[in-house]
């Protein structure tokens, strides 16, 4: 039987891995330069955590979660998103004792049972961060500013930040009533999911992928904001304008998770076609209380690594790739192998990437393998070289080679490589 990867998953290797490392390392640098700490949460959680946070009527809970019973009969779900686990960890570990304005970032796999397509897999990966404590629109501004900084640091330019405010529980009551009236007139035209959600969670109709055209003419949340939410949204836009962070007001935007309040945003890249979203986020001031804690304001963002990499490729952005096979040490004989291992250790201490042959191949086979793996240089050590107290350094691109005194080989090779 030939085993194959599960549908909706990917193996990542070769040049592709450098795109992943570039995105992840850039994200870490941006977060840590802004005082955001890393947090790591389990890949699976109690199912109820996501039902309560994401929303029982959301597509994620209704159709997309990987849920199973463990041997103790508990309902367990592979995490479909990263915010709820961070909130759970914050509450369970009493991190509130550290004070307000805490910041945590995460990088890792998420799982949703969707139809696999370009950049949207069943196991996908996200970078994200959460800022816990501040209620001020200054925090909303900082989140969007940091997302913009991260994407620009990657080299991306062909994206737009879509922005909206969906209000708070106070002003959302009137908005729900307006939506009820609007959708009530066209209820017979809606899909079965929307007909059900009309009774249970009217806001989810705005996020329907089947009946999306109806949302274009639906009442807009910004027209129903209370004074506090309207002032919050206005101030956020003032900050963005002052710092020249470009955005597009999009009053059809609600995001697909029930926990959002007030600010929501989504980043869309023009090179990705209809599935253009590469990141998104917003404020979730009621989530801590919903999950059993005290009322704590919070907000955050998540970006899809696969989607961001597609955007990098769409813009033709060159990323740094390190040659992990830079120097290859080819040896002939046991004594030569032992000396090759010692030389490899000396070169690695100087920060070079070095392979040593361990296949007992002929010299021609070793050099062919070195070229195939992309090595720039080969160091050749045999009985004759040992007798003379030298090694041979060959440039595999030009074919030029030079004899080097063994005692100075590590210094010479390191200096030669540094000049390339």
Curated annotation (Swiss-Prot):
Top-level taxon: Bacteria
Annotated catalysed reactions: tRNA(His) + L-histidine + ATP = L-histidyl-tRNA(His) + AMP + diphosphate + H(+)
PROSITE patterns: AA_TRNA_LIGASE_II
Matching Gene3D superfamilies: Anticodon-binding domain, Bira Bifunctional Protein, Domain 2
Key words, A-Z: Aminoacyl-tRNA synthetase, ATP-binding, Cytoplasm, Ligase, Nucleotide-binding, Protein biosynthesis
SUPFAM superfamilies referenced in this protein's UniProt entry, alphabetically: Class II aaRS ABD-related (SSF52954), Class II aaRS and biotin synthetases (SSF55681)
GO cellular component, one term: cytoplasm
Database matches in InterPro entries: aa-tRNA-synth_II, aa-tRNA-synth_II/BPL/LPL, Anticodon-bd, Anticodon-bd_dom_sf, His-tRNA-ligase, HisRS-like_core, HisRS/HisZ, HisRS_anticodon
Known EC number: 6.1.1.21
Localization: Cytoplasm
Record GO terms (molecular function): ATP binding; histidine-tRNA ligase activity
One of the GO BP terms on file: histidyl-tRNA aminoacylation
The keyword Iron-sulfur appears for this protein: no
Subunit details: Homodimer.
NCBIfam families linked to this entry: hisS
Similarity-based family: Belongs to the class-II aminoacyl-tRNA synthetase family.
Protein name as annotated: Histidine--tRNA ligase
Organismal lineage: Bacteria, Thermotogati, Thermotogota, Thermotogae, Thermotogales
Gene giving rise to this polypeptide: hisS
